Curated annotation (Swiss-Prot):
Protein's name according to its UniProt entry: L-rhamnonate dehydratase
Family of the protein in this entry: Belongs to the mandelate racemase/muconate lactonizing enzyme family. RhamD subfamily.
This enzyme's EC code(s): 4.2.1.90
HAMAP family: Rhamnon_dehydrat
Site positions (Increases basicity of active site His): D291
The record's free-text note on cofactor binding: Binds 1 Mg(2+) ion per subunit.
Site (Transition state stabilizer): E338
Location of the active site: H318
Binding site for Mg(2+): D214, E240, E268
Length: 392
């Protein structure tokens, strides 16, 4: 059959949860006292929202084909991302065949190179790319994972990220990743509290459950080394994103310093094959965690994953709900997936991008069979107020 072309590209913003999962009301574990690069300043230590972690908000990209089919995706980018989509990127999509995703990605990336490369521009390109995959899969009446080569496993298994790994174990997850609460600015007392928290959690979950620490770019090499060496007693499986994303040299040193058997992970805030090439060739980590909504989308994640596979490094994408699930189920070097516990107390399983998406699947007993609904299999919640700030 003749493939349709792209007729319209539209960009919307929405507040309150969704893809910007830090945009939560008060009392949520994700905005508690968590170590961050800004924790060196006491006034920004207690809450991540205090320094503006949620200022961007969610970006919704909607792409309509000439046959009326509509694909969409969500990511973090807000009004800045909407401006980039409407004022710059739309010209590379409208009028193109829905199949020409590689060409469209290439033109979006290289046309923004002078002000992009990473950050909100790559978030935005990622959102457009995911919407293109959703659109193409809907045109072909297939789930996205079939376009990626088909599943290599019957179901996904998950670890949980949240404040209560002990409850995650009861829910059937294979492991739990804790947010590190205290960084270098809080001295020896903070380091002691980090280790006490880990010891307490190990006593609750037993020895047969993974425990990991998410350090969210907040440490330096000496502190991260001390933390890793002391945490080894409690069976820490990996230590995550300890350093700023551009400190490839520090990551390489840290990987040499950690105890034998403990993994170093990073990549949540890295982007494109070129950024991950640095991590891989400099032997910075044992597993990479690209976020498909930030690293360049599915089109770029395919390349990143192949590069990692050639280096015998696992790919465990960061969060991103269905956009990750459809990829992970198709890759041998992605043996498990992450699930962000978005219940305020991390005490129940709720959809990761709630309330924005409908039909968003969640793990049951830590497992999930990825739905075979066309596209990514989700719908926008009509009760969420979408605003199009830059209509054309």
């Amino acid at each position: 059959m003749a493939m349709p072309t792209i007729r319209h590209v539209r960009a919307f913003i929405v507040r309150g949860g969704g893809a910007d999962y830090h945009d939560q009301p008060g009392g949520h574990w994700i905005d508690d006292h968590i170590s961050t690069p800004m924790a060196r300043y006491p006034e920004y230590r207690q809450s991540r929202q205090s320094f503006g972690i949620n200022v961007l908000g969610t970006l919704v990209v909607e792409i309509e084909a000439s046959d009326g089919t509509v694909g969409f995706a969500v990511t973090t980018g807000g009004e800045i991302g909407a401006f980039i989509v409407e004022k710059h990127l739309a010209r590379f999509l409208e009028g193109q065949l829905v199949t020409d995703i590689e060409k469209m990605w290439d033109q979006m990336y290289f046309s923004t190179l002078y002000y992009g490369r990473k950050g909100v521009v790559l978030n935005t390109i990622s959102g457009v790319d995911l919407a293109l995959w959703d659109l193409l899969a809907k045109v072909r009446k297939e789930p996205v994972y079939q376009l990626l080569g088909g599943p290599v496993r019957d179901e996904l298994v998950f670890y949980a990220t949240g404040a209560r790994p002990d409850l995650a174990k009861e829910m059937g997850f294979i492991g739990g990743k804790l947010p590190l609460q205290h960084g270098p600015a809080e001295g020896e007392a903070g380091l002691k509290q980090n280790l006490e928290k880990l010891a307490d959690m190990r006593s609750r979950v037993g020895d047969d459950f993974w425990l990991m620490y998410d350090c969210w770019m907040s440490l330096d090499v000496p502190y991260a080394t001390r933390l890793a060496q002391a945490a080894h007693e409690y069976g820490l499986k990996w230590i995550e994103e300890c350093l700023p994303p551009d400190d490839y040299w520090g990551y390489a040193e840290l990987r040499r310093n950690v105890p034998r058997g403990m993994m170093v992970s990073t990549g949540e805030h890295e982007a494109t094959r070129w950024g991950f090439r640095m991590l891989l060739e400099m032997q910075c980590c044992d597993l990479i965690q690209p976020d498909v909504g930030w690293c360049g989308g599915i089109t770029e994640l395919i390349k990143i994953s192949a590069l990692a596979d050639a280096h015998n490094v696992m790919v465990v994408p960061h969060g991103s709900s269905v956009y990750s699930y459809h990829f992970v189920v198709t890759r041998h070097n992605s043996p498990f997936a992450e699930f962000l516990m978005m219940a305020p107390k991390a005490d129940e399983v709720v959809p990761m991008f709630t309330p924005l998406l409908l039909d968003e699947p969640v793990p049951v007993n830590g497992r999930m069979k990825v739905p075979d609904t066309p596209g990514f299999g989700v719908r926008l919640n009509p009760e969420c107020a979408l605003v199009r700030p830059y209509p054309r």
